[in-house]
Amino acid sequence: PWTKVIPAIGLSPRDCALIEPMSVGFHAVSRAQVTDNDTVMVIGCGMIGLGAVVRAALRGADVIAVDVDDEKLALAARLGATHGINSKTEDVHARLMELTGGSGPDVVIEAVGSPVTYVMAVDEVAFTGRVVCIGYAKNEVAFQTKYFVQKELNICGSRNALPADFRGVINLLKKGNFPTDR
């Protein structure tokens, strides 16, 4: 219904196309309850993952972007990621241990939907960490469930966004702080 419409006056059609996927990333950061004391790893730097990078950075978190594409990692850096890891060419675990002093990230946001990245999220998150899964795995994911218990993890899913997430993205785009040319 019309009551659900959020005006995006002044934005180009290209900008408007970014609102929904970025809002999903914004919402995942809210679900993870990210604060400025957190180190957040975002796996996958597509539009949804980049939305998570932006929102986590805006909340003051240290953001580690992980992807297989150096161009996407460079864009993530422009949007607030403090570190980037190319999982195709680097040892993700070793680099995370280096960046986090051996503890792993406090929060992992999985935005790919691959069984490999689901397992990576659980394996790499810190003790008492938080994992938010956005991506849909098309195949079964096999976990060592002892890690859930031993690491005392909080794991949740996130699939959409709230009106506040949409408004946040629209305001960000109106300020011109997001490079929509990429």
What is each PLM-predicted segment?
Residues 1-6:
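Glycine-rich phosphate/adenylate-binding loop and adjacent beta-alpha elements
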Residues 11-90:
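Mid-domain Rossmann-like dinucleotide-binding core that forms the NAD(H)/NADP(H) cofactor-binding site
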Residues 81, 104-105, 180:
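Local beta-strand N-terminus motif with an aromatic residue
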Residues 93-98, 138-182:
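C-terminal substrate-binding/catalytic core of Rossmann-like NAD(P)-dependent dehydrogenases/reductases
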Residues 99-107:
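A glycine-rich helix->loop->beta "capping" turn
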Residues 109, 132:
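N-terminal Rossmann-like NAD(P) cofactor-binding module of classical short-chain dehydrogenase/reductase
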Residues 125-127:
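Helix-to-beta-strand junctions that scaffold the AdoMet/dcAdoMet cofactor pocket
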